[in-house]
């Protein structure tokens, strides 16, 4: 399907540029409302709107609200909430849809939206296509206007849901946890979840001002978390991104534990203590060491395209309940419908509790293969498969690794970059090849 507005993860861009304007968001809200009204007997029902902590979120919230109301749809306003919380609340309120205003791990100058259907799952391609078709039509106000209201205790509902995914009596008592909330949507929720389960919580990056979301903090900037874990002699550090659908850990030695390692810990726990793990979906970027570690436990593994939409699709096709990405998007489909940083973190802590080991000890069960990724900024699209210079460079890199590694080049679905990933047995060679390939890609797109 050729998309005009929607990317692999909704619509995203710099505020004030392209379609990231209040005018477009009002038109988009109206289009969403019209499509829902056509597909639901009750005329569109209720749509929930939540957001992260970007200052532009207020503007876009009001614009979407106006468009939806003009289409005759009622609106429930959740305020700042993690993306997975909005998916959960959409499902439990039996709302027609849920809308998230966020640009995830991007800086505050960016914003965008994600949409969930009534099951709390990202919209199907045909629904997005219908919305794109509608959004370009003249906006006509419905005969019956919708109404808007604030949703009471949305935060409390989600906190109780998170705690309820653990066995009765589960406790984090005696554990010191540093939680980095990226000055984003988890700033109020995450510390409460862990403290209410008994952990001693040291919360950092929990003072959003509208502009400091993801600024030198959160799951993409772990330096502060590593420092705080070591200085406070904490047992563990947990970092979320701006909208709370990604998570990364830091162990008691201050070492990063990424999404592949966290997925393996969860899968191994399910295999040993949870009645088995039917299979795990990773992505093209998943570390080969992750695949080998799962193979040793006889857990099936499949690679999907990058993007939680494709991970979930592969999970559904296989009937598996666990999948995710190296970046920390982890989907535990036995308890939720989308990537959820807090839920994934709780599953890791459950595994640590069962094994009675530290995170550093537990992660040793999976040996990562050296992997280097370089992001190459691009100003124009490049067909990688048809570019002779790029393909020659890839073939030469693979030949130099003598079949003991992987090369992957792919355009990002959320940023104007091409990601160059090289994986092999020797870090020095892997790093050299990755940067050489990045130079070739840079020349090809200049």
UniProtKB/Swiss-Prot annotation:
Report what the Swiss-Prot or TrEMBL entry states about this protein's PTMs: Activated by phosphorylation.
Cofactors: Mg(2+)
Q: Per its UniProt record, what PROSITE patterns does this chain match? A: PGM_PMM
What keywords would UniProt list here? Isomerase, Magnesium, Metal-binding, Phosphoprotein
Task: Cite a GO CC annotation.
Answer: cytosol
What role is this protein assigned? Catalyzes the conversion of glucosamine-6-phosphate to glucosamine-1-phosphate.
Q: Which HAMAP family match?
A: GlmM_B (MF_01554_B)
| Name used for this protein in its record | Phosphoglucosamine mutase
Gene symbol here is glmM
């Amino acid at each position: 399907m050729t998309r005009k507005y929607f990317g692999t993860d909704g619509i995203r861009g710099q505020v004030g540029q392209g379609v990231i304007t209040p005018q477009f968001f009002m038109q988009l809200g109206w289009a969403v409302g019209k499509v829902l009204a056509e597909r639901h007997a009750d005329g569109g029902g209720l749509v929930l709107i939540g957001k992260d902590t970007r200052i532009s979120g207020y503007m876009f919230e009001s614009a979407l609200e106006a468009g939806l109301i003009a289409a005759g749809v009622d609106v429930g306003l959740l305020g700042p909430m993690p993306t997975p919380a909005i998916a959960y609340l959409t499902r439990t309120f039996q709302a027609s849809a849920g809308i998230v205003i966020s640009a995830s791990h991007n800086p505050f100058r960016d914003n965008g939206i994600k949409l969930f259907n009534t099951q709390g799952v990202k919209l199907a391609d045909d629904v997005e296509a219908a919305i794109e078709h509608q959004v370009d039509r003249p906006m006509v106000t419905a005969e019956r206007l919708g109404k808007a209201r604030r949703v009471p205790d949305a935060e409390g509902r989600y906190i109780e849901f998170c705690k309820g995914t653990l066995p009765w009596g589960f406790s984090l008592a005696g554990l010191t946890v540093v939680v980095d909330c990226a000055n984003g949507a988890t700033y109020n929720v995450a510390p409460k979840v862990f403290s209410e389960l008994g952990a001693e919580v040291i919360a950092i990056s929990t003072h959003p001002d509208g502009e400091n979301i993801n600024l030198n903090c959160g799951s993409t900037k772990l330096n502060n978390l590593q420092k705080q874990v070591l200085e406070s002699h904490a047992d563990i550090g947990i970092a979320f991104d701006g909208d709370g659908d990604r998570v990364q850990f830091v162990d008691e030695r201050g070492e990063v534990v990424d999404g592949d390692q966290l997925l393996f810990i969860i899968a191994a726990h399910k295999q040993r203590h949870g009645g088995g793990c039917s299979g795990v979906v990773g992505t093209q970027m998943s570390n080969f060491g992750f695949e080998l570690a799962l193979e040793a436990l006889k857990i099936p593994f499949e690679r999907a395209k990058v993007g939680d939409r494709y991970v979930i699709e592969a999970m559904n096709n296989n009937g598996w309940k666990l999948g995710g990405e190296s970046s920390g998007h982890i989907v535990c489909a036995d308890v939720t419908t989308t990537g959820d940083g807090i839920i994934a973190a709780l599953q890791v802590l459950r595994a640590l509790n069962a094994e009675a080991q530290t995170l550093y000890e537990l992660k040793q069960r999976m040996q990562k293969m050296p992997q280097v990724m370089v992001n190459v900024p691009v100003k124009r699209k490049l067909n990688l498969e048809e570019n002779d210079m790029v393909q020659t460079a890839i073939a030469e890199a693979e030949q130099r690794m003598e079949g003991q590694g992987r090369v992957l080049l792919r355009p990002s679905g959320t940023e104007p970059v091409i990601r160059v990933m090289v994986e092999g047995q020797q870090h020095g060679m892997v790093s050299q090849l990755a940067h050489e390939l990045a130079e070739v890609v840079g020349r090809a797109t200049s």
